[in-house]
Amino acid sequence: MRRKLCTLVLALILVLTCAIGFVACDPTTDEPVDETPTHLDYFDFDGKTLMVWIGDSIAEGIVGPSPLSERENYAYYAMLGKGNDFTYVNKSVSGWKSGQLLTYLTDNAYKDDEAAFTTELLQRADIIELSILGNDLLQDNLGKLLVMTCQYLEEMEEKGESDKLDYVNDILFNDVYQYAGYNDAEKALGKVKGELNPNNSTDNFAAIIERLYDLNPDVTLLVQTVYNPIFDTSTLVLEQPITYVDADGTTKCWNDDTRTTREILLEDYGVTPAEYRELGDFLIELMNNIVRDYAEDHPGTIEVVEIHDRFMEYHNADTSEGQAYSRRLFSQDYIHPSNEGHAMIADVTQDKLVELGLAGANYLAEIKAIRCEQLDRMFSYAGSPVDVAAAKAAINNATTAYEANLAYFNAITRPEYFDEVANRNGDRAYPIFTYVVPNYANNK
């Protein structure tokens, strides 16, 4: 009995000692100071730069990097974190629109342990990179928005409007984009009536930036623009054809037409599949201008990372196979970036870090090491279709990270082309680029 009592007393003393250890006095005031560990006390920063990513699925890097087990080598946040020798944390959530991110940052309903951890990270971060706004557009009915855009542009021509940009901002933006947020005409037009529309992308974006600076006034804040993922067969634009089963059991398209309803509607406005990308870019750039306009109106607050422009430059410069190679930047859902797309986003962000004097000194060497390690671990086995030695030589001879990544992806990309599995029309097939499947079991 005495032994049990002694054990209990010792345990109580130990607990009290630990608790007292978390409280100290401020030497200038003799007031007690709470030294209870926070989430960040479990990080070993070791004097390194802390970079935090927050935003949507593009930043989260769950959809796109393939195989997912290589996310920490393919996703752009990891490439930048490792390559610059940063302490890095990704707090992005797939599917987030601007309103959801704003709510997460401000609403008391989200003040759980995970949200508290995110807040502490944002307060401590040296650099934050934000990826948002893409879902405000792409997660809604993009095909419908394209048709509505055609309608508005036609009205503009009929009315003889001279200033296309003003017309689009005043009419298209207020109507179409707020429909995208609400899908309810009365609520969507609330802002036009002078009421605050909490689902408006422009207002949300401004509030997000202000909130981040409230949390961390000294942070360097990078904001990505949204790339254009639209091609002539984009599932973002085209719904499936309307079909019916004939009396003999044969599935047929309505009106014996393999085109979808939306294809027909767009064609009525003189828009061919080859022009979907241009029309889609018209909408995407309206969304990107929210970021650019904020940067111009609030100088010194955000650094714009022009993902859109770099992707577009690559697309416009690529004329091989009817500009097919620019599709390598996208995963097979043709929405999210592929491994190669993530590498390009990393390149653009790294250029900005270099411009700001925030980049690590050994980025190129680190990227080369990552790619060579992957080659050795995943593709160096008997019978491998990848010439590992040649690929490593090309990587090590590269003078930029872009060249090193390109050498790697060229080596592991299969040369065969595959038609889209669910392609509706043979003459609308396009190549799908796939990677050599890693063989972890048989590597040397």
Go through each PLM region and give its residues.
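Structural recognition of the beta-strand scaffold that forms the well-ordered cores
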Residues: 50-55, 59-61, 87-92, 126-131, ...
